[in-house]
């Protein structure tokens, strides 16, 4: 697959989020939002969540195999700490994707025939 054909769900989310209707309190109004936008948001969020989880798993496996290098000091402790913080943020981003996709799916279940949960 060429780079131009690789799905880029984070870019899709950034382009779609401004199209989400918000209420007077600044909260998303999924029922008032366009169903096409909601379906696209859900699809992008779900794909991004899967990509993040697979990436987190891969980095975790690499760290597990690199434990000897960490023990003997071949890897700087700051590097390991930075990876830990990165993994924490990626995990939070994956959870946020699920939290975004779920109400999008609920609001469009009658349109798509696909419910959530």
For every predicted segment, state its role.
Residues 1-117:
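Sequence/structural signature of long amphipathic alpha-helices
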């Amino acid at each position: 697959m060429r780079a131009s054909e690789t799905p880029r769900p984070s870019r899709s989310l950034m382009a779609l989020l401004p199209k989400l209707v918000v209420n007077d309190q600044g909260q998303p109004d999924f029922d008032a939002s366009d169903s096409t936008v909601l379906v696209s948001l859900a699809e992008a969020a779900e794909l991004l969540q899967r990509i993040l989880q697979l990436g987190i798993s891969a980095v975790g496996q690499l760290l597990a195999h690199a434990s000897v290098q960490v023990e003997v000091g071949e890897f700087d402790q700051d590097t390991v700490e930075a990876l830990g913080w990165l993994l924490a943020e990626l995990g939070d981003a994956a959870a946020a994707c699920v939290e975004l996709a779920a109400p999008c799916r609920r609001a469009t279940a009658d349109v798509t025939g696909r419910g959530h949960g």
